[in-house]
Every structure is written in structure tokens, then in C-alpha cells.
């Protein structure tokens, strides 16, 4: 499967809220849903099921 750079950027370059798990833009400083400021980058590797 070929990896499309635009698709990777759109799906993986996100910030995840540690409180409510909402997806936020890469440059966000606080969550768009709950206002929490502790955001983590979305994992680039798939987790084992």
C-alpha cells in the first residue's frame, strides 16, 4: 500500500486531549471541546490489537 503524504498529514498530524480524547489541530494549545491544556501528539505508529 502506497503512503500518500497528504493523507498522512491530514490524519496523523493532530494533538489529542488527555482529558476527553478529542482531536485538535497540530498547533492547538488547548482543547477545542473542554479547554484542557494538556495535549499530546497523536501516535505515528499503529498499536498492536
Curated annotation (Swiss-Prot):
Gene Ontology CC: ribonucleoprotein complex; ribosome
InterPro entries hit by this protein: Ribosomal_eL40_arc, Ribosomal_eL40_dom, Ribosomal_eL40_sf, Ribosomal_zn-bd
Protein keywords: Ribonucleoprotein, Ribosomal protein
Molecular function as annotated in GO: structural constituent of ribosome
A biological process term (GO) from this entry: translation
Family, per entry: Belongs to the eukaryotic ribosomal protein eL40 family.
Record's protein name: Large ribosomal subunit protein eL40
Matches recorded under SMART domains: Ribosomal_L40e
Lineage, highest ranks first: Archaea, Methanobacteriati, Methanobacteriota, Stenosarchaea group, Halobacteria
Organism annotation: Haloquadratum walsbyi (strain DSM 16790 / HBSQ001)
Superkingdom, taxonomy of origin: Archaea
Entry-linked PANTHER family: 50S RIBOSOMAL PROTEIN L40E, LARGE RIBOSOMAL SUBUNIT PROTEIN EL40
Amino acid at each position: 500500500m502506497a503512503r500518500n503524504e497528504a493523507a498522512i498529514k491530514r490524519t496523523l498530524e493532530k494533538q489529542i486531549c488527555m482529558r476527553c480524547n478529542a482531536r485538535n489541530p497540530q498547533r492547538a494549545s488547548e482543547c477545542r471541546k473542554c479547554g484542557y491544556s494538556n495535549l499530546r501528539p497523536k501516535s505515528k505508529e499503529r498499536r498492536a490489537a
